[in-house]
Amino acid sequence: MMPEIGNGLLCLALGIALLLSVYPLWGVARGDARMMASSRLFAWLLFMSVAGAFLVLVNAFVVNDFTVTYVASNSNTQLPVWYRVAATWGAHEGSLLLWVLLMSGWTFAVAIFSQRIPLDIVARVLAIMGMVSVGFLLFILFTSNPFSRTLPNFPIEGRDLNPLLQDPGLIFHPPLLYMGYVGFSVAFAFAIASLLSGRLDSTYARFTRPWTLAAWIFLTLGIVLGSAWAYYELGWGGWWFWDPVENASFMPWLVGTALMHSLAVTEQRASFKAWTLLLAISAFSLCLLGTFLVRSGVLVSVHAFASDPARGMFILAFMVLVIGGSLLLFAARGHKVRSRVNNALWSRESLLLANNVLLVAAMLVVLLGTLLPLVHKQLGLGSISIGEPFFNTMFTWLMVPFALLLGVGPLVRWGRDRPRKIRNLLIIAFISTLVLSLLLPWLFESKIVAMTVLGLAMACWIAVLAIAEAALRISRGTKTTFSYWGMVAAHLGLAVTIVGIAFSQNYSVERDVRMKSGDSVDIHEYRFTFRDVKEVTGPNWRGGVATIGVTRDGKPETVLYAEKRYYNTAGSMMTEAAIDGGITRDLYAALGEELENGAWAVRLYYKPFVRWIWAGGLMMALGGLLCLFDPRYRKRVNPQKTALEAA
């Protein structure tokens, strides 16, 4: 009975989403305030109905209702209860329901926190978000219903959740990533509303920027957590593999970063209007593209879900409709919001525009590297592979000018400035950068690698100028805002991430060895000694745990416990890496296959500064959070001066 209630709630949600898509827009056309205000009620009803359906599915997992096909395929009675809850979004149907839940949640949030925004804007934005919900609800109900039954011949035991997903990462990574994906729908809806009305000014940016910041924060956290999860779970010792689905999350992050900076220019200088709208459309369009890549089954990825052609065609059609319609609208009405401001070459606006172009170029590189093998194969031209060397080389060339401009940008004034005003500061920063980028590799690794020096030069340039500019502001008693300190934190976070990448990419040591009890291997300054392997049993798995002692200069450093697990129901073997993490290095061991004479295949790593990559990501997210506290976003705006008046 409960699954039928869940299905009924989804049908109800579809009806409400249709009303939300049409009725408020009718009110805008008629100038009827009550009809426009109904958008908030519909948003609340939509969220409640989808949340109800989602809770029904969670309950089905918790009580092991194997009459539901989705539950029977992704859970069993031996699975710990917290993984049963997380299994709700662990596969195709449930993850789509999570998407719709978060979509309705963002819609409801806009309805709640838009009391200071003119009613006609709210009606347009919520209606557009309702249209997106309609598309996904139709997709769920007709191709991916999570409440489909196994009746009358239901199994007494489920197949189990994919062992790769039986990790705390599943609890947090998909919701955070989807919060970012779906959050960009708010900026998208504001952009479409602006194009429909044909007017845009700095008020638009004030409305849109906090929502874009929130989405960007969630997406940043999702990417950081996903990278850390891959690092410790897959046993490869890597933090980024340029996997197509990793790229699918990275592309909207790049464009979203450009969008945040472009919104700052639109808010401060009423410039870059059409460019800002195009970025808002592109960010959400790339989120839809990522969904298509994961759900359609057109690519090979450790993240991709097996899917039938009907699902892929539905998503493709929906994606073409949304993206194509949005771009056509932009082509037809973009000229109505075009800026008439001429920016000086040496101004903050121009430097931000240059960095925006570099971010978009980086996105296009990732897009090309992701889709070209797919297109090449579909055209019958054979299989090609675009791997890490291509991406790393292209990003290096793009990031050097990006870092250069990023360091200088905050020092330059809006409108027009003179380079000579900051000449002395730039000279000091250049000398400091040169010294640090040569000294740090020698201090920590006793050798200098050219690519490490280049990476550290970018990081030090950004960090030195950010700290110097902040110190100057404090010494002069200049007023600072939350947005300013958020910018400083985010830029320093990027510098920290670059340091982590530079060291881990160029100084990591990897050894694949054959070890038995008593064998030792030296890596860097550490000696790894294989002690023994003992049997161990978990709630739904059994396996062995290897004990590996680590010493440094003859003194005990740590003990690593690397596991090999066999999951009973799934019938699959998994590696659980052992990691001893530190501020400046990680020691990493992964247990491979058992060999003859009591020996085991073991993979050992020395990873310097790898945790700085994720620490920098967290600092960037913190910077975004500080920007959200800026009081400008809580001021009421005069409806007569809004950027989005009724057409």
Model-predicted segments: where are they?
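Membrane-interface interhelical loops and short amphipathic "cap" helices
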Residues: 1-9, 32-36, 59-93, 145-174, ...
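Contiguous transmembrane helix-bundle modules in multi-pass membrane proteins
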Residues: 1-34, 45-52, 66, 244-252, ...
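A conserved hydrophobic secondary-structure block that centers on an alpha-helix together
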Residues: 11-22, 28, 95-227, 235
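Membrane-interface helix-boundary motifs at transmembrane edges
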Residues: 30-39, 113-125, 197-208, 267-274, ...
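A generic, lipid-embedded transmembrane alpha helix
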Residues: 45-62, 135, 218-225, 286, ...
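Transmembrane-helix bundle segments that line or gate the permeation/cavity pathway
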Residues: 50-73, 77-79, 86-111, 139-149, ...
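Extended, hydrophobic alpha-helical segments in both membrane/secreted and soluble proteins
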Residues: 175, 182-192, 204-262, 275, ...
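Soluble non-transmembrane domains of integral membrane proteins
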Residues: 511-603
